[in-house]
Structure formats: structure tokens, C-alpha cells
Amino acid sequence: MAKTIQAIRGMNDCLPTQSPLWQKVEGSVKRVISAYGYNEVRMPIVEQTHLFKRAIGEVTDVVEKEMYTFEDRNGDSLTLRPEGTAGCVRAGIENGLLYNQEQRLWYMGPMFRHERPQKGRYRQFHQVGVEVFGLNGPDVDAELIMMTARLWRELGIDQHVRLELNSIGSLEARANYRTALVAFLEQHLDVLDEDCKRRMHTNPMRVLDTKNPDVQAILGDAPKLSEYLDDDSKAHFSGLCELLDAAGIQYQVNERLVRGLDYYNRTVFEWITESLGAQGTVCGGGRYDGLVEQLGGKTTPAVGFAMGLERLVLLMETLELTDVRRSVDVYMVTAGEGTLMAGMKLAESLREQVPGLRVMCHFGGGNFKKQFKRADNAGAAVALILGETEVAEQTVNVKDLRNGEQVTLPQSDVFTKLAELI
């Protein structure tokens, strides 16, 4: 017997029992984003490797350890996208979307990182990204945060997430801060683990988000980034906080929040839950005003966020917010000569007259008991039953599968009855 082929570790199937909750989350995401007038963009999942090296930073964990990179038959180095912002910027530059104009874009799709798989962290994962180009004020930062807050309310998880904010300032301010931070860390080399020592020389601000409790203990005495911020960044952050206060959105300023990608500046933020253990970040974003120019475009202010769908789905499962619409509304049961075709025609008529109604026809024969069992397994609320008599008389038996009540009606009245039952 041939060996069974299995999915790649960290890359999971979404099965029919799981997909309704995914569809609910995706539907809510699309409704909320569309309510703000943003437009969808779709990019390839494979990009040239140097795009991510230039955008994310060559000394980040993503580029150094986590990317799926390979050579194609032409010898070009290609990478499965580990995040969406770089590809969105590339698409905007290449297609002239960012030339002296404002763009508000969103995308949804799979991303890939070679990490150790664990609950809430996978090698193929799905992200929703929202990106705004051409606006540099704190007002659009606030709108993005308000958008995410609206989504949490729609999903029913707003009481289970909290917002953390920070400003990491301009490039010059961060350079001055890095010098002070490295000087501080060099005084505590005996406490730093090997990963922190490596980061101290490549990307010292990443030491701030270490999970090592011994290092966390000394960071309380480390220089504070807020003391090195330029005046423009301070004013921008103050304006953002005022807008969030006016909107009634609660937040906590976390001076150690720096995000893991090099392209961020000024505003950074994360939405965090305590319900998922170590994988608590469900959404993160911030400003990246230099990235468009860094990738070959004109100087263009930009801000955005990304959220992981796996973690949102996992959070809703953890909170038992899994009540979703059934996959089948009506199940067509037929028995006798010529009844199957009559049932298929009636089902097609229902689909045309009631958009969104989900009608499943029984195929494969079998007695009524077998067909009703299939209807229950499909999760249908109502069964429509056609025998030879009903076909001849243009009637149909309508059975409510939730309470067993059954009535016989003219086929022309079945639409009205279904509206009552579903």
C-alpha cells in the first residue's frame, strides 16, 4: 500500500466544519473595510527576494531565518511572501498608483514563514492588510485604529482585546536612541542571552521586545525612546492620542513596543489578547513613511496594519463565539418515478427567487429514512418532500426538521412558507 501523503508541517487544511467560521470572519472584515471606502488589491504570493531584503531589513529574523526562498529555472532568487506590505508598495509603484495621489487599499491572502509551528503560529498563515498612501497626519492613523475597533465589535471580541501604542520617531531620532541603548546594553552583557547580544549589534531596538525575563528586568532602567523623539513625532503622537480619546478608544502607551520590521517610523500599535497565551498579538501596524522611496518610488507617507486570520478564528473558538449560519437551508427529498428531476427544477427555482438560499438536492437514491438522515447531517433546517402524487398535483410537503412539523402546500406557496421558517 502506498504511503499516505500528508500536508507540510505548519500548513493546515481548512475543512468543511471549520470554513463557516472562517467565512464569517472574512465577511466581517470585508464589510468593515468597505464601509470606510477602501479598495481591494491582489498581489502575487511570490516576489523577488531582494524586495523583502530591502523592505523588511536584512538583519531581521524574518529575512535571516524565516523566509521560504528558492531559485527558479532562470536562476532568479524568489521568495514566498512573508508579509504583504512590501508587495503592496511594489505593486503601487510599478502600476503608478502612488504617483502624486492618495490610495486606500486592502488585501487578504496567505503568507509564509518558516517558524516553529505552534498554536496560533503557522508556516502558512492568512493575513488581512490595510495600507494608506499619501496622507501624513495622525487622523488617518486614528481611522485605521477605529476601523480595527469596529471589526472587534462586529466579531464580538472587543472586550477581549486591548490596544498598545508607541511612537518610535524619525530615522534620526532612532539612530540617536540606538547609540544610547547599545551603550546601556554593553554595561549588562552578563545578563544578555546570545540572541540579545546578536541583536544588540544588528538591530538593538529588537532587544526591547525580548521574552527573556532576566533581560526584561534590566530594561526598566534602559534609556527611554520617548526622551529621544523629535518634535514632529511628538506632535504627531500627541495628535493621535487626542483623536483616540475623542473617539472613546482606550489604549496603553507601551514604550517598549517597536514592531519586528525595519520599515516602521513614528506610530506603531498592536491589539493584544490575553486569551491566546504567548501568541497574543492579533493585529499590528504603524507608519512607514520612508518605504515607498526606499523601494524606488517618490517620497510618500504611508501607514497600515495587518491582522492574522488564524488567530482571530482561534480567539473566537476560545471565546466560544462559533455560532455561524448553517451551510444548507433546505434539503430536497424525492422518491418515485420522475420526482428527482422535478425536485431539481423546484430547487433551481428557489435559488433564483430567493438569492442566498442554500438548497441541497439528495442524489444516490435510498428510502426516506436515509434521505432524512442526510438532511440532518447537512444541517438543513427544512426538508422539501416530493413523491409521485406531489409532482402530479404540483404540491410539496414542507417539513421543519427542528420540530418535526409538516404541511402540504401548492408549490407556488413554498417561497412564502420558507420565508417564515428560515
UniProtKB/Swiss-Prot annotation:
PROSITE patterns recorded: AA_TRNA_LIGASE_II (PS50862)
Annotated compartments: Cytoplasm
Chief localisation class: cytoplasm
Enzyme Commission no: 6.1.1.21
Nucleotide-binding keyword on record: yes
Nucleotidyltransferase as UniProt keyword: no
Pfam families in the cross-refs: HGTP_anticodon, tRNA-synt_His
Catalysed conversion reaction: tRNA(His) + L-histidine + ATP = L-histidyl-tRNA(His) + AMP + diphosphate + H(+)
GO CC annotation: cytoplasm
Keyword field: Aminoacyl-tRNA synthetase, ATP-binding, Cytoplasm, Ligase, Nucleotide-binding, Protein biosynthesis
Any one GO molecular function term: histidine-tRNA ligase activity
Source species, domain of life: Bacteria
NCBIfam families: hisS
Self-association and partners: Homodimer.
Family classification: Belongs to the class-II aminoacyl-tRNA synthetase family.
Protein name: Histidine--tRNA ligase
Species whose genome carries this gene: Aliivibrio fischeri (strain ATCC 700601 / ES114)
Gene: hisS
